[in-house]
Every structure is written in structure tokens, then in C-alpha cells.
Amino acid sequence: MPNPPRTAAIIVAAGRGLRAGAGGPKQYRTLAGRPVIARALQPFCTHPEVFAVQPVTNPDDTAIFNDAVTGLNFRPAVGGGATRQGSVRAGLEALAELNPDIVLIHDAARPFVTPDLISRAIVAAGQTGAALPVVAINDTVKQINAEGCVEATPDRARLRIAQTPQAFRFDVILDAHRRAARDGRDDFTDDAAIAEWAGLTVSTFEGDAANMKLTTPDDFIREESRLTALLGDIRTGTGYDVHAFGDGDHVWLCGLKVPHNRGFLAHSDGDVGLHALVDAILGALADGDIGSHFPPTDPQWKGAASDKFLKYAVERVAARGGRIANLEVTMICERPKIGPLREAMRARIAEITGLPVSRIAVKATTSERLGFTGREEGIAATASATIRLPWGAEGLAG
């Protein structure tokens, strides 16, 4: 085996996760503002020793999967099977053309895997060919019978809780999965059990107590509180934008195409509301302004839709491990009237940012017929953004 070995990863995300509640697969729920599946994928996608990441998903989830993992680099997802075992086999078969030396198999419902744990998995598989991370059991364990009565008290010193990523030589675990399928065995709950059944010696290495699997609603409540408490660097930014009227029959405001007797004079679509929000978010990040990221001298932004700019700003927050707590924009104009459009604007901003509409405010005022807005020569907008970042997240994402 080469050193370092060619390592690929399979992220199993085809389950329905109904025990977690919320009416949908748990891997697509957000945790501290970010989808669980994105949290699980990113450490593998960015690990320097992992050259290929293969997601396995339910084909019915294609749209929500694509929305959840924007910006991550991985192989096209393949459809899973009727069981976790079948889904892993589908991922292994998809990787067969690459023939990696080692494969890491990880559950998407474990979003707290660390680069260090991934590195330990690669080393362990290189040494023994089959290995899984484990953590000790601190509580006394009881074995009970069908009536709920205690039958035995196992020695907890020899018991461990299994985690993922489980790591294997690719050829041996692929062969074990194929043999199990031929023999009609589809009842294994993890890949180490298949390796054991196939006669392989499975070693263990130190896991991580924080690398827990999200299963129940209480798991989400607890981890949401823990992650939010870590985001103690609370920042506020402000933004301002203005555009003059020119010829046209509509204006773009807060992501909506609004009929009007004038248009905007602008390099992009001139959406003053979204531009002000972008500057507010970038200001909270101390990350320049909209002009430094999208220069008006660059022809690629000519006529560009401003929702692209706002999505980019939101991604900058996520790249720093943060979340947006609140967005507020105030439109300053005589016409068009903002009141009838307010709720549609809030909904559109929520759609662009992925935030609940309850965290978005759209307000309107006039300048009492004073100044350029009072003379109906253009529209102005002010905005504020409150974000939460983890302490020590000063470095900008590339």
C-alpha cells in the first residue's frame, strides 16, 4: 500500500431519519444554521488525505441535497438501497472505478467528525485493514430479558460504543459486501459487523465523545444549544445603497421585480435593498464591501441578479462557522409603495438566505418630499445585519 494511501470516503445519507421528528430526513435539518449533511460532508471534502468523497442519497431527496451542500466538492451522489447496508454497497460500487486503497464509511447523521478523527481512521486502516472508532462506556450496562428483567451485568471494561467513520482496505470491504449480498444477508447494522462476518479481524482506535449520532428530537435540541453557545462573537454591520431612476418599466427591490414607470441606472440589476443587505453582512464580517467583491468595472456583473450577491455574503458567514441572527432593511422612497410588497419581500429574502422569515424585517419610510428621494429621482435603502461567529474565527475564508 502506498504511503500515504489513496483514501476515499462514503457518506451514507439515504435514510429517512423519522425518529428525529420535524417531518423530514434528519440529515437535511439545520443545526445552528447549517444543514447536518453539510456539516458531515465538509471535513472529508477538505481533508488533505481524502481524494474522493462519494455521497449516497435517496433519489427523492436530490433537490434538497443539492441545496444543502452548495460549495462543497464531491463526486455525484448515487442512489441508496432499501437498507443502510445496501446504500453502503452502492457507494462502494460507485468507487470501484477509482480503486482507492482505503475507504472511510461515515453516517451523515454524525455531523461532528473532526479532521483528526479522519486522520486516525486512515492510519488505523493502513495498519490493520479494518478498524473502527470506539468510545468507552462510563455507565453500568444491564442485559435484560423479554420481560424487562435483568439477566446479567456485562463487564463494561470490555464494552465500547461504535462510531463512524469506519475504515477498511477498499478491496476487502467491497468483497465482504458483495459476499453478504450473494448470501442474502442484509441485516448488518454497521460495516464492521460485515467485516467480522467475513472473517476479518477488526481493530479499534480512539473515537471522539463529541462525534455523536443525531437520532431523536432531544439530540437536536441539546446540540443546537451547545453550538449556539459557542457562537459568542456577536457582531452587527450596516449597509446603505442608492440608485437613480432612468428609463424603464420596472425596478428590482428586495429580490422582487416591481412594475414602475421608471427603471434603475445601475451596473447590475440595481436592487438597492439586497445591495444594502450585502454590505451589512460583509461589514459585520469586517470583510470589505460589495464593491470590493463585485467591482462595477468587471463586465461579468453587468446586469447581474443581486440574489447572487446576497447568497455569496451568506456563504461567507457560513465559511467562518457562523450564522445570521437577524436581517433588517429599510426602503426610502415615495414610489413604488412598499407596504403592499412587504411580506413578499420578506419571503424572497428568506428564500435567498435560507433564514426563517421571522428573522427578516422589511420597513419603509419617505423623506417627506425632501432630497432626491422626495423628488422621486431614485431610491435609497439602509440595512443592518446581526451575525454570530465562533470566537477565534478572524481568518477569512478564501
UniProtKB/Swiss-Prot annotation:
Residue ranges, annotated region (2-C-methyl-D-erythritol 4-phosphate cytidylyltransferase): 1-234
GO MF, one example: 2-C-methyl-D-erythritol 4-phosphate cytidylyltransferase activity
EC code: 2.7.7.60, 4.6.1.12
Site feature location: Transition state stabilizer: 19, 26, 267, 366
Pfam families on file: IspD (PF01128), YgbB (PF02542)
UniProt keyword terms in alphabetical order: Isoprene biosynthesis, Lyase, Metal-binding, Multifunctional enzyme, Nucleotidyltransferase, Transferase
GO biological processes: isopentenyl diphosphate biosynthetic process, methylerythritol 4-phosphate pathway; terpenoid biosynthetic process
Names of required cofactors: a divalent metal cation
Record bears the keyword Metal-binding: yes
Known catalytic reactions: 2-C-methyl-D-erythritol 4-phosphate + CTP + H(+) = 4-CDP-2-C-methyl-D-erythritol + diphosphate; 4-CDP-2-C-methyl-D-erythritol 2-phosphate = 2-C-methyl-D-erythritol 2,4-cyclic diphosphate + CMP
Residues the record lists as binding 4-CDP-2-C-methyl-D-erythritol 2-phosphate: 241-243, 267-268, 289-291, 365-368, 372, 375
UniProt similarity note: In the N-terminal section; belongs to the IspD/TarI cytidylyltransferase family. IspD subfamily.
Biological role: Bifunctional enzyme that catalyzes the formation of 4-diphosphocytidyl-2-C-methyl-D-erythritol from CTP and 2-C-methyl-D-erythritol 4-phosphate (MEP) (IspD), and catalyzes the conversion of 4-diphosphocytidyl-2-C-methyl-D-erythritol 2-phosphate (CDP-ME2P) to 2-C-methyl-D-erythritol 2,4-cyclodiphosphate (ME-CPP) with a corresponding release of cytidine 5-monophosphate (CMP) (IspF).
Protein name as catalogued: Bifunctional enzyme IspD/IspF
Source organism (scientific name): Rhodopseudomonas palustris (strain BisB5)
